[in-house]
């Protein structure tokens, strides 16, 4: 159970970081 929770936590963190980087690159391109 702990492993599954840690896996989802890591997946959520990776998704958040990817979204932030993607939005950042998009804003730089718009500018």
Curated annotation (Swiss-Prot):
It is a single-pass membrane protein. The chain crosses the membrane at residues 4-24. InterPro entries: Cyt_b6/f_cplx_su6. The keyword Cell membrane does not apply. GO terms for biological process: photosynthesis. Keywords: Chloroplast, Electron transport, Membrane, Photosynthesis, Plastid, Thylakoid, Transmembrane, Transmembrane helix, Transport. It is found in: Plastid, Chloroplast thylakoid membrane. Pfam families: PetL. GO terms for cellular component: chloroplast thylakoid membrane; cytochrome b6f complex. GO terms for molecular function: electron transporter, transferring electrons within cytochrome b6/f complex of photosystem II activity. HAMAP family: Cytb6_f_PetL. Component of the cytochrome b6-f complex, which mediates electron transfer between photosystem II (PSII) and photosystem I (PSI), cyclic electron flow around PSI, and state transitions. PetL is important for photoautotrophic growth as well as for electron transfer efficiency and stability of the cytochrome b6-f complex. The 4 large subunits of the cytochrome b6-f complex are cytochrome b6, subunit IV (17 kDa polypeptide, PetD), cytochrome f and the Rieske protein, while the 4 small subunits are PetG, PetL, PetM and PetN. The complex functions as a dimer. Belongs to the PetL family. This is Cytochrome b6-f complex subunit 6. It comes from Oenothera elata subsp. hookeri (Hooker's evening primrose). The gene is petL.
